[in-house]
């Protein structure tokens, strides 16, 4: 795992924690001043943001540790655990918002000075957009699952702040139920995002295979290589930033062992050029012993 990856994901986690802390202080004041249930929803979400981002920061640092005697495949799965923990945090906040929205829908209460809430929400919206932009850039560079989960979380915050702006504006014009209705809608959306995030984390923990397009690229690299007659038993998974790739190459029976080994090394390097940092295991099989049943990839 290269130093650039560790530096970027750590900075993304620190930035998220710092931003969530700043927004929490701003929203506490805004809620105290206006009494808006939508701002209360945003405040609770910021509390969850801090917990999730702190968890993310600690777990990311752990996941960056190199492989050791007890964890020979590294610590990358800790990122999936962080994403799963975040989904639980977010689900809890969504339930709280939903219940609070119902309570205020039954007994709507006019808020004080919605203008202050609007200003605070605009500030929160701008700050969150800046954070999401930075996280998206980090995800493109690292493919970190933990940072991607955090980014999805803050993307939902962008939509939430937009909805809060609209709710505050409507409340300013006398429609006090709008505040509670938007809190309900925000809670439903956040719950959906949490469930989706949790599903992706569980799939990673269950060693889901790499995406179809990446597997096809691996097959194309292998089967187009000189000296390779075909391939079978491709197995893939991902742990943190590391892809694990296993495949059997089919070679002519008459090919000397040393030459077969050289071809396998060349194929491995070709895969690593396309997927840097991967853990690649290649086994060579003579064509005469390859079973004709099962998953095979032959030359076209």
From Swiss-Prot:
Record GO biological process: intracellular zinc ion homeostasis
GO molecular function terms listed in the Swiss-Prot or TrEMBL record: cadmium ion transmembrane transporter activity; ferrous iron transmembrane transporter activity; metal ion binding; zinc efflux antiporter activity
InterPro entries named among the record's database cross-references: Cation_efflux (IPR002524), Cation_efflux_CTD (IPR027470), Cation_efflux_CTD_sf (IPR036837), Cation_efflux_FieF (IPR023783), Cation_efflux_TMD_sf (IPR027469), CDF_Transporter (IPR050291)
Compartment(s) where it occurs, according to its Swiss-Prot or TrEMBL record: Cell inner membrane
Purpose: Divalent metal cation transporter which exports Zn(2+), Cd(2+) and possibly Fe(2+). May be involved in zinc and iron detoxification by efflux.
Quaternary assembly: Homodimer.
NCBIfam families membership: CDF, PRK09509.1
UniProt-recorded name of the protein: Cation-efflux pump FieF
Gene behind the chain: fieF
């Amino acid at each position: 795992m290269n130093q650039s990856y560790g530096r970027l994901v750590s900075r993304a986690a620190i930035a998220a924690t710092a931003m969530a802390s700043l927004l929490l202080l701003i929203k506490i004041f805004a809620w105290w001043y206006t009494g808006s249930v939508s701002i209360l929803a945003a405040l609770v979400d910021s509390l969850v943001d801090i917990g999730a981002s702190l968890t993310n920061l600690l777990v990311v640092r752990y996941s960056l540790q190199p492989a050791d005697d007890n964890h020979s495949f590294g610590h990358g799965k800790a990122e999936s655990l962080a994403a799963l923990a975040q989904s639980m945090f977010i689900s809890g906040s969504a339930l709280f918002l939903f219940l609070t929205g119902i309570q205020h829908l039954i007994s709507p209460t006019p808020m004080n000075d919605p203008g202050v809430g609007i200003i605070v929400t605009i500030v929160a919206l701008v700050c969150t957009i800046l954070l999401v932009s930075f996280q998206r850039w980090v995800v493109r560079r690292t493919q970190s699952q933990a940072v991607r989960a955090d980014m999805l979380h803050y993307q939902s915050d962008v939509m939430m702040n937009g909805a809060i702006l609209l709710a505050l504006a409507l409340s300013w014009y006398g429609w006090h139920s709008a505040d509670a209705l938007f809190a309900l809608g925000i809670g439903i959306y956040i719950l959906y995002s949490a469930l989706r995030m949790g599903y992706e984390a569980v799939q990673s923990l269950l060693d889901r295979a790499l995406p179809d397009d990446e597997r096809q690229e691996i097959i194309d690299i292998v089967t187009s290589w000189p000296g390779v007659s075909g391939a079978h038993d491709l197995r893939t998974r991902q742990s943190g930033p590391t892809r694990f790739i296993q495949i059997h190459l089919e070679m002519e029976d008459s090919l000397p062992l040393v030459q077969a080994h050289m071809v396998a090394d060349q194929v491995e390097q070709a895969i690593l050029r396309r997927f840097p940092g991967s853990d690649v295991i290649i086994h060579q099989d003579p064509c005469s012993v390859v079973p004709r049943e099962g998953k095979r990839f032959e030359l076209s």
